[in-house]
From Swiss-Prot:
Organism of origin: Pongo abelii (Sumatran orangutan)
Family: Belongs to the krueppel C2H2-type zinc-finger protein family.
Keyword terms: DNA-binding, Isopeptide bond, Metal-binding, Nucleus, Phosphoprotein, Repeat, Transcription, Transcription regulation, Ubl conjugation, Zinc, Zinc-finger
SUPFAM superfamilies per record: beta-beta-alpha zinc fingers, KRAB domain (Kruppel-associated box), Retrovirus capsid dimerization domain-like
Residue location of crosslink Glycyl lysine isopeptide (Lys-Gly) (interchain with G-Cter in SUMO2): 27, 181, 228, 280, 299, 304, 339, 375, 412, 440, 478, 560
Residue spans of biased composition, Basic and acidic residues class: 270-289, 297-352
Name of the molecule in the record: Zinc finger protein with KRAB and SCAN domains 1
Keyword Translocase part of the UniProt annotation: no
Classification of source organism: Eukaryota, Metazoa, Chordata, Craniata, Vertebrata
A GO cellular-component term linked to this record: nucleus
Length: 563
C-alpha cells in the first residue's frame, strides 16, 4: 500500500508541479490583462463583446496534445464549450439551434460555406434567407425566366473565384478568399465539422466539373428544393393590410352583407350581431331605415286595430254567441291592452332590431307575430330574400360591382360605407381598439382579437393532417398547402408558382431587379430587409476587429469570472 502511494506520488509530482506552475502563470497573465483592460481607465465599456465564432473555433480546434492529461483535456474542453454555448444565458432551444446551424453549414458546398462565413448567421433560418437571396442575386444576372435550377447556380458560382469576383457578393469576399488561398494549414479531424473560413479549400475555376456537382447538390433538377426551403422560411412581409389578412377581410365583408340579409328575421332577433359587425356611420344609416319600417308597422297596426274595433262592435250586438271573456278579447284595444312608447314594455314586447319604439296592440305582443317581418324583398340575380329594401340594395352591389364610396385621400373605392370608414383610419392613424394587457392599439377590432390570442395562448385552428394548431385561420390555410401541395400564386413572367403571396413578391424582384433595402454605410442594396440586417454585422465586426486578441481573451476571462 505504501509502495503504491509512493509510486503515485512520484509519478504525478512532476505533472502536478507543471500544472501548478501553469496555473500560476495563467493567473498572472489574466490578472495583468484584467488590470490593463478593466482597470483605472474603465475601457471595458467601450469594448464590444467578442464574436461567438471565436469561441466556437477555439472549441473545435482544441487539441489533446496541448494538455497534460485526459482529465485536464476534458476540463478544458468543457470550459471552451461553455464559453461558446453560454448555457447561463442561452436556452436549450437556442443551444440546439447553434448546433444545428453548425451542422447545416458543414453540409453545404465549400463555396457557399465561404460566402456564409462573411455573414455568420445566428440561426438556420437566417442561413436559409441568405441562400435564397443569393439565388435571387444570381438569377438577376441572367435573362429573366430562362435559367433555373442547377444550371443557374452553376453559372452564378463561377464568379466565386477571387479573380472574377461578382458584384453581387459581399465587399469583403475578396479579402477572405485571398487569406484563405494563401493558408497552408490542413484541417484536423475535429475541425471537419466547423469548417472555418481559413481551412476551406479554394473554389474551383470556371467550368470545372466540381462546380456543377456542387450546384446539383444544393438544387434538384426540377428546382423543387428551393420551394421546400421557401416553405421553411419565415413570412417576411407582414403589414396590417398585407397579404396575410386579405382573405380574412373579404370574409368579414361577406359576413356583413349576409348579416344585413338576416337582420330583422322573424322580428329581428339578430340585431345585436349586426350592430357588432357594422360601423357607427352605417348604424346611423340603418336607424333611418328602421324608422321607416317602424312607421309602416304603426300604420298597419292602426288599420288592424280599427278593423278589430268594428268587429268587436258587431260581436257585441250578439251577446248570446260569445261569453263575456270572448267579448273582452275581441273588443277594441283599450289603454291597458295597448303598449305605447311612453309606457313600460315587457321583455317579450321590446322587439329587438326595430330601431324605434312604437305602439303594439295586445294581439301583437311579440316580434315573432309581426306580419311584415317576412322576407319580401327578393334578389332577381340569385333569388336571395331580405326583410328590408336597404339590405337588398346593399346585396345587389355584389352583382353589379358598384363601389360608390370613394376615399378622398387616395381615391380607393369601396362597396360599403363601413369599409370606407375602416380604410380612412390608415390615413388618420386612428387606432381606437386597445389591448388591456399591453396597451397596444389597433385600427380594427378583428386585429385586436387576433392580438389578444398572444396573451391567452389560444390556437383554435388545428390542422387535420398533423394536428398543428394556429391562432389565425389564414396561417392554417397557408400551412395546409404544405400537405396539399397547392401553389396558387403564379408568376406572370416565367410561370413559377408559390404557395405564399410574399414569396411571389420576392420572386418578382428577380425580373424587376428591385433592391429596395440599401445599406447607409457602403451603399450595397438587398432584396430583403432581413438580409440588410445580417449585412450590418459585417460593419460591426469591422469595428470589433480594431481590438487586439488580448482584449478578447480578457473579455472571455471576465465572463468566466462572472459565472
Amino acid at each position: 500500500m505504501m509502495t503504491a502511494e509512493s509510486r503515485e506520488a512520484t509519478g504525478l509530482s512532476p505533472q502536478a508541479a507543471q500544472e501548478k506552475d501553469g496555473i500560476v502563470i495563467v493567473k498572472v497573465e489574466e490578472e495583468d490583462e484584467e488590470d490593463h483592460m478593466w482597470g483605472q481607465d474603465s475601457s471595458l465599456q467601450d469594448t464590444p463583446p467578442p464574436d461567438p465564432e471565436i469561441f466556437r473555433q477555439r472549441f473545435r480546434r482544441f487539441c489533446y496534445q496541448n494538455t497534460f492529461g485526459p482529465r485536464e483535456a476534458l476540463s478544458r474542453l468543457k470550459e471552451l464549450c461553455h464559453q461558446w454555448l453560454r448555457p447561463e444565458i442561452n436556452t436549450k432551444e437556442q443551444i440546439l439551434e447553434l448546433l444545428v446551424l453548425e451542422q447545416f453549414l458543414s453540409i453545404l458546398p465549400k463555396e457557399l460555406q465561404v460566402w456564409l462565413q462573411e455573414y455568420r448567421p445566428d440561426s438556420g433560418e437566417e442561413a436559409v434567407t441568405l441562400l435564397e437571396d443569393l439565388e435571387l442575386d444570381l438569377s438577376g444576372q441572367q435573362v429573366p425566366g430562362q435559367v433555373h435550377g442547377p444550371e443557374m447556380l452553376a453559372r452564378g458560382m463561377v464568379p466565386l473565384d477571387p479573380v472574377q469576383e461578382s458584384s453581387s457578393f459581399d465587399l469583403h469576399h475578396e479579402a477572405t478568399q485571398s487569406h484563405f488561398k494563401h493558408s497552408s494549414r490542413k484541417p484536423r479531424l475535429l475541425q471537419s465539422r466547423a469548417l472555418p473560413a481559413a481551412h476551406i479549400p479554394a473554389p474551383p475555376h470556371e467550368g470545372s466539373p466540381r462546380d456543377q456537382a456542387m450546384a446539383s447538390a444544393l438544387f434538384t433538377a426540377d428546382s423543387q428544393a428551393m420551394v421546400k426551403i421557401e416553405d421553411m422560411a419565415v413570412s417576411l412581409i407582414l403589414e396590417e393590410w398585407g397579404c396575410q389578412n386579405l382573405a380574412r377581410r373579404n370574409l368579414s365583408r361577406d359576413n356583413k352583407q349576409e348579416n344585413y340579409g338576416s337582420a330583422f328575421p322573424q322580428g329581428g332577433e339578430n340585431r345585436n350581431e349586426n350592430e357588432e359587425s357594422t360601423s357607427k356611420a352605417e348604424t346611423a344609416e340603418d336607424s333611418a331605415s328602421h324608422g321607416e319600417t317602424a312607421g309602416r308597422f304603426q300604420k298597419e297596426f292602426g288599420e288592424k286595430r280599427d278593423q278589430e274595433g268594428k268587429t268587436g262592435e258587431r260581436q257585441q250586438k250578439n251577446p248570446e254567441e260569445k261569453t263575456g271573456k270572448e267579448k273582452r278579447d275581441s273588443g277594441p284595444a283599450t289603454g291597458k291592452d295597448k303598449k305605447t312608447i311612453t309606457g313600460e314594455r315587457g321583455p317579450r314586447e321590446k322587439g329587438k332590431g326595430l330601431g324605434r319604439s312604437f305602439s303594439l296592440s295586445s294581439n301583437f305582443t311579440t316580434p315573432e307575430e309581426v306580419p311584415t317581418g317576412t322576407k319580401s324583398h327578393r334578389c332577381d340575380e340569385c333569388g336571395k330574400c331580405f326583410t328590408r329594401s336597404s339590405s337588398l340594395i346593399r346585396h345587389k352591389i355584389i352583382h353589379t360591382g358598384e363601389k360608390p364610396y370613394e376615399c378622398s385621400e387616395c381615391g380607393k373605392a369601396f362597396s360599403l360605407n363601413s369599409n370606407l370608414v375602416l380604410h380612412q383610419r390608415i390615413h388618420t392613424g386612428e387606432k381606437p381598439h386597445e389591448c388591456n394587457e399591453c396597451g397596444k392599439a389597433f385600427s380594427h377590432s378583428s386585429n385586436l382579437i387576433l392580438h389578444q390570442r398572444i396573451h391567452s395562448g389560444e390556437k383554435p385552428y388545428e390542422c387535420n393532417e398533423c394536428g398543428k394548431a394556429f391562432s389565425q385561420s389564414s396561417d392554417l390555410t397557408k400551412h395546409q398547402r404544405i400537405h396539399t401541395g397547392e401553389k396558387p400564386y403564379e408568376c406572370s413572367e416565367c410561370g413559377k408558382a408559390f404557395n405564399r403571396n410574399s414569396y411571389l413578391i420576392l420572386h418578382r424582384r428577380i425580373h424587376t431587379r428591385e433592391k429596395p433595402y440599401k445599406c447607409t454605410k457602403c451603399g450595397k442594396a438587398f432584396t430583403r430587409s432581413s438580409t440588410l440586417t445580417l449585412h450590418h454585422r459585417i460593419h460591426a465586426r469591422e469595428r470589433a476587429s480594431e481590438y487586439s486578441p488580448a482584449s478578447l481573451d480578457a473579455f472571455g476571462a471576465f465572463l468566466k469570472s462572472c459565472v
